[in-house]
């Protein structure tokens, strides 16, 4: 018996279940809110929470969008790109956006709280700039990034809007050896370097 579950496969598998809602809180306060919401719904609901606790970044710069399904923050004035992400990796995206902003590249970060289903039509007015990055720690095939990119691009093309350059950055289809988070990240980075 070898442990293989890294939390990278669950979204892809769970989102294939008809009628499911999936939440990905990134703080203890949001975890409580998500659990309360899950209990109040008369539907199948999954709440995922990463091991390792609450990631550290400045949440005060984020404001609610799309009702309460997501939050957004602009790092700099007139963002030239939008990053959509969720969960623990939001901290990494926020730190990267701070660094880019300090160098003159403004970025909008959108963090999904409810990661499936996502209302692509409601997200359209929140997109900024000429590029869209969908960033997740999950498996790419069937993941939030892949599904949301398809929905957003379809909605934009039907509406006749500008279609941004779009990149889904997720774990390519492979098994990741079991280990703590830093070991897993190191393994993935090494594999990506060999693949490029």
Residue map of PLM features:
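Short helix-loop-beta junction
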Residues: 13-16, 92-109
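Conserved small/polar residues in nucleotide/adenosyl-binding loops
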Residues: 1-4, 186-193
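Glycine-rich, acidic loop regions that bind phosphate or pyrophosphate groups
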Residues: 147-176, 180-181
